[in-house]
Design a protein with these regions (language model features):
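Conserved catalytic or regulatory cores that recognize and/or transform ribose-phosphate-containing ligands
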Residues: 1-114
Length: 114
């Protein structure tokens, strides 16, 4: 099974990236193929186009996306839209910031997975 992890990359807390990397390593040790954006995409891309292309290719192979949602991450919004459009199973793992009472993508993910 192929799993794509949606998480913040740019401006992400390095300690949090380390924790998420451990999650990816654990999934790999269980036999899953995992796309972890901080490690599996060329972060030195000056325009971001190559990053988007690499993510799109990985997303097309994904059976599931596991989401560590950070509402401030623009890349996470982009990736979630791809997953939703492709009809990939969305697994909400953690919401990085408290969610208010209003509509939100986190609530959409939780409702769609339930």
């Amino acid at each position: 099974m192929n799993i794509y992890i949606i998480c913040a990359v740019r401006n992400a807390n390095p300690e949090r990236v380390h924790e998420l990397r451990a999650y990816a390593v654990r999934l790999r040790s269980e036999g899953y193929d995992v796309h972890f954006p901080p490690d599996d995409a060329p972060q030195e891309d000056p325009t971001g186009e190559k990053i988007c292309r690499v993510h799109r290719q990985a997303m097309r192979r994904a059976d599931e996306v596991h989401v560590f949602w950070d509402v401030e991450s623009k890349g996470s919004h982009f990736d979630l839209g791809m997953a939703y459009a492709l009809g990939i199973k969305i697994v909400p793992v953690h919401c990085e910031k408290p969610d208010g009472p209003e509509k939100s993508y986190w609530k959409v993910m939780c409702a769609a997975s339930g």
